[in-house]
């Protein structure tokens, strides 16, 4: 709680946090030597969102971990649907030589792992679109990173890590340089990108 309150009150701290949860099933988390549980994860996320209503939470999940049953995966899907993370990536479990997980029973077929990965990503795609559509009409501060081939500017908000999160495509009537901060009105939204125009001073 002390750390959450520090984040909420510090003006120079972005309300963005990356928590690599990887799964929500209690048994799987225990086998991964994680101290967290489904209930504790939900409690932490709830406290973060209560303290910072605008917080954007990024996480990563692993689909097809050894021993993951159909029921376990269904729980993971329901968890992602309930939590509605602003940013989420998912990867199929990769068997790495020399790791404990590589020797565990219940290895999931590669095709099944990829199918489960695709299902979570399809779900997250709709969640991301929902979050982005809610931003249409808002004015957001954007960090300019460059220009597209058609002359549109490319940037990101304080809620987007470079290379992995959303981008903002926007127009401006003036010349901008990478590193500039501008106010952009969001006029359209896609799954993983926002479209806008600079607010004239």
Spans of model-derived segments:
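Terminal RNA-binding accessory module
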Residues: 103-201
């Amino acid at each position: 709680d002390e750390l959450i309150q520090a984040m909420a009150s510090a003006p120079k701290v972005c309300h963005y946090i990356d928590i690599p949860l990887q799964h929500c099933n209690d048994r799987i988390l225990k086998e991964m030597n994680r101290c967290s549980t489904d209930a504790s994860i939900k409690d932490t996320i709830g406290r973060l969102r209560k303290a910072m209503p605008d917080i954007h939470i990024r996480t990563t999940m692993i689909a097809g971990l050894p021993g993951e049953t159909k029921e376990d995966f269904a729980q993971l899907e329901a968890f992602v649907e309930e939590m509605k993370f602003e940013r989420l990536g998912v990867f199929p479990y990769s068997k790495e030589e020399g790791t404990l997980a590589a020797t565990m029973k219940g290895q999931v077929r590669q095709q099944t792992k990829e199918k489960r990965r695709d299902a979570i990503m399809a779900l997250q795609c709709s969640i991301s679109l929902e979050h982005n559509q809610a931003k249409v009409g808002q004015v957001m501060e954007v960090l300019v990173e460059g220009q597209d081939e058609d002359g549109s500017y490319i940037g990101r908000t304080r809620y987007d890590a470079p290379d992995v999160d959303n981008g903002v495509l926007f127009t401006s009537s003036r010349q901008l340089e990478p590193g500039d901060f501008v106010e952009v009105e969001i006029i359209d939204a896609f799954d993983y990108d926002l479209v806008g125009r600079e607010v004239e001073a």
